[in-house]
Amino acid sequence: YNKLKTRTFINNMSRIGNTATDRFTFKPRMNTEIRGTTHLKCFQEHKEKLFKCMVSLKYKKITNAAVLASIRMRIGSVNQFRPAYAKFIYKKYNSKKVLDISAGWGGRMLGAMACGIDYTGFDTNLNLVEPYKQILAAYPHEGTCKLVSVDSSTVDYSTYDYDTVFTSPPYFMLEKYEHMPTY
């Protein structure tokens, strides 16, 4: 987070900040279902195939990164929005008050925190309420961050003050979020 906050120029494809959100939202992401399974179930049910994949990918050691790479090759990945890209967008458009109708894994919020700007995010995934609180508590920031656990399609946006709307809609057709309705 400190690198994300202090660097004045960050390549918009940078992964800086990803581990800051992973620290709190990695587990719910790994419990998100894609292609009929989760990363955890894939590991439990296909260890032998995953190890063969690691060998074919020429990993010399079995590490968390090697296991994740093998799982992603098998079923795909549940990606987070890069906080560095969010920061890039906020800086480019001189954002001061961001509205995010689908807060997701916290990447856009972390980008706003690193910029010291206000952020209001909506998300119905109740499994993320505690991780959001943990992110806010873990990283010092100047702007106000507000997270609201409601369906953003029911919100009266005229009651909010914002100069930027920036979001990444959920991938309901590809991902099934834990304890969430299927659309």
Language-model features: where?
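Long, acidic/serine-threonine-rich intrinsically disordered regions with weak helical/coil propensity
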Residues: Y1-E33
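Class I S-adenosyl-L-methionine-dependent methyltransferase catalytic core
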Residues: Y1-L4, R29-Y183
